[in-house]
Regions:
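Juxtamembrane/disordered regions of integral membrane proteins
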Residues: 3-150
Length: 150
């Protein structure tokens, strides 16, 4: 990888970070949900009318306590962290741009999640969305420690 074109290497770093971020996000979701005692999320019924599905999700989120939101919060941030870490390790110039782009893609997923699942607590959404880029920055800082700039 040392003789590769830097632009191509940075594109590859961004793609690798984005690919790693998805399973890293999902990896913690179920274990943290069990750890906090969160009730199982309702099953998705594609035949149900949208209003019924929205009511089910709102009732589900209303039944949760603040501690139950730690699982989704930490798993979302884990995706941004791991994706930025991988991008930072692979990127040609060790700059912040590629890891933050990866964290930004994960942030876009978090914003989409806020619109797709109705009834999520506003405080959770605010903390969740505000955390993606700082956690991506932390992933980049760890990448610099693991593989410092030559």
């Amino acid at each position: 990888l040392t003789v590769m074109n830097p632009i191509l290497r940075n594109i590859m770093a961004g793609m690798a970070g984005s690919i790693v971020s998805m399973p890293a996000n999902m990896f913690l979701l179920a274990p943290l949900g069990r750890l906090t005692g969160a009730p199982v999320a309702p099953a998705f019924d594609p035949t149900a009318p949208p209003a019924a599905t929205e009511a089910i999700w709102r009732a589900y989120f209303d039944s949760l306590e603040a501690v139950h939101m730690l699982g989704p919060l930490l798993s979302h941030w884990n995706g941004a962290f791991c994706g930025a870490l991988v991008a930072g390790l692979i990127a040609a110039n060790r700059g912040l741009l590629v890891p933050l782009i990866v964290a930004g893609f994960v942030l876009i997923g978090g914003i989409a999640n806020a619109f797709i699942l109705p009834g999520q607590p506003a405080a959770f959404l605010a903390i969740d969305i505000l955390g993606y880029l700082p956690v991506g920055w932390l992933g980049w800082k760890l990448a610099l420690r693991i593989r410092p700039v030559a």
